[in-house]
Amino acid sequence: MPTLRTGFAVPLLLILIATLVSAQKTGPSDAEYIAQALSAAPEAVAKAAAVVRMEKDGKITTLREGKNGFSCMVIGGGEKMCADANSMEFFDAWAKHQPPPNKLGLTYMLSGYDVGGSNTEPYAMSKTADNHWVVTGPHVMIVGPASKSLGLTSTTDVDPAKPYMMWVGTPYEHAMIPVGSDKTKPKPVAERK
């Protein structure tokens, strides 16, 4: 049986390994991910925020330690979020279908990349004829049961350019507060990075 000479085998093996490693790596580099995640918050908050990434197995990896109690990440379909500790508890409870903590939390989603969400169904993953899908664009969220006391509109069909309550009547009801002008609209999907 013919064999490859060592002079060919080693470079060929290295190319094969590099190709396999490259094919297995998905998503942005850590540096790219950090930059994307930090785009969710104002610069003053982003400078001292932690950056975390949820791995495919559900494990949270800290890419950068923080100093101000905020954690920034890329979520779902690429949306960027920067949340304080109370908000992180709120979203953890939501993910586990558990009652949220009785604490107010602040979350920034300022990057302008918003794939939207159901205004009525906390676990809806896509638009349907009756789940009142809304795309808000850049916004902040006030989460926690006390957010109801803000007195914002709680209709199901909202104007996403004005503050409103999302997921009304569920334990995860929270305030959505758009920022920027009413002309601020998310970029088309093809233009998003």
Where do the PLM segments sit?
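Bacterial N-terminal signal peptides that target proteins for export
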Residues: 1-11
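Primary mode marks residue(s) on the alpha4-beta5-alpha5 output face of response regulator receiver
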Residues: 25-193
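Bacterial N-terminal signal peptides
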Residues: 9-19
